[in-house]
Amino acid sequence: MPAEGACDAASLMTLTATLSDVTGLANLLKSVAIQTHAVVIASSSGLEIITELNRTLQAHAYLYSHMFDSYRFENAQDDVRGSTSLQARSRPKKRSKLTSKHAETADSQSSAASSDHESGQSQAHTKKRFRANSHSYAQEADRVHDEPDSVSFEVNLQTWISCLNIFGGVGPSRPHSSSSGLPGFRPEQGSAEAPPGGRGYQRTRYGVADAYGAERGTSVERGFDRNPFSSSAKATRMKLSYQGHGNPLVLELEQDANVLTRVSMSTYEPSFLTDMVFEPQNMVAQVIVASELMQSAFTEIDASCKKLSILITSPHSLSTYDGDQRTEAPAPTNRNTSASMLKFRAISDTGSSEMEFPASLTSSDPTGVIEKFVALPGSSEQWYDFTLLSRTMSVLRSSIKTSLRMDEAGLISFQFMMPKYRRAAAAGAPLTNAAAGQAAHEDEQDAFCEFLCCPLDTSTLIV
């Protein structure tokens, strides 16, 4: 019975969201598609899509409620929790009444001399238990109410992406296959090596390959558009709904007034996810750069590279903390060691290579490639599996900025700022829906996704 009641309450949960253009959503889902299936966590604040690889790499895509044209999440468990908390608070009163009745019966059966003393002790003990139970029930009820309401399920991410592009016009797919999805793939449109017609056979980590694999067409047709919200393609509207545990995820896609497609995707029990959380208070280093810079750095790494070290260093990282006060250490005499920089060191079968990106000391320096640079005491060189970090190449090609953060334990966080999530209405185009057109103009937000990667064990690492 309790299990059935929980399932019934979960089945009453309602999630409904609408979007006037699915381009941003599709590109965001493609960025975290490192696995076939993904875990979706829905709450009143929005959706979170999580994929995990080898218990070492996690990808998170955050779709906040304000990114949708309309978003509604209702949880029927609120009523169930409310009734449970009321019952919990009423239990101590029932216990106190029973205890008082028991004390009165004991008083009538005991002698007059000892009854006053025993009843006084019984009443004091009863009041103490009542206060303790009331306090514990109140804490439990407050803890239940403090927990955010959410529901999690698992879906086939590749199916979801394919459904969003059912009418076309969403934009080219960002494949993760053995051709264009290679970590070393670098589009070179307009280069002298490209053959006439725009068709390119670009240099990859594994030699020369077709830039877009089995997909035939010119680079202009198949290449990624840096402005996915151009007015050349028609927008695909979407309505997403989910009715709770055991129910499918329903997508209603519409491009024209007379064309409507309804897709029902199966949902599964969410898989176990590794507890990987980046705590901001444990951050020891942070760098914000343009995604193109990070992409070019990863592209230049040799194909046989297995291990990559990342070092964020500055003269301030040599300082020590004394409580809230920071004491600067004497500046080193070596100019190279005193420079603030982001350093990559890759080890491959053919040797090792190093790349250094100096940090600009002044915001007015136009030659600086790093927008923000933070290196606190405790920042040290950390090694990572490059085959996992190379999974970020697809999102590097479609993002604008990249924030690289590192904590004391070496856990690294890549946060990618994606292009504008909503589609701007074309100039002079008639708006069939005034509300949707107004929403497209207002409150445009930058979406982002995050990759978390654990470091290698340096105690057993052979460099």
Swiss-Prot record:
One of its GO terms (molecular function) is double-stranded DNA 3'-5' DNA exonuclease activity. It is an enzyme of class 3 (hydrolase). Residues 81-128, 172-203 are annotated as: Disordered. It comes from the Eukaryota. It is found in: Nucleus. Disruption phenotype: Cells are very sensitive to UV light. Belongs to the rad1 family. Plays a central role in regulating the genetic system of this fungus. Has a 3'-->5' exonuclease activity. Its EC number is 3.1.11.2. Gene3D superfamilies: 3.70.10.10. Keywords: DNA damage, DNA repair, Exonuclease, Hydrolase, Nuclease, Nucleus. GO terms for biological process: DNA damage checkpoint signaling; DNA repair. GO terms for cellular component: checkpoint clamp complex. Residues 90-100 have a biased composition (Basic residues). This is DNA repair exonuclease REC1. It comes from Mycosarcoma maydis. The lineage of its organism: Eukaryota, Fungi, Dikarya, Basidiomycota, Ustilaginomycotina. InterPro entries: Rad1_Rec1_Rad17, Rec1_exonuc_Ustilaginaceae. It catalyses: Exonucleolytic cleavage in the 3'- to 5'-direction to yield nucleoside 5'-phosphates.
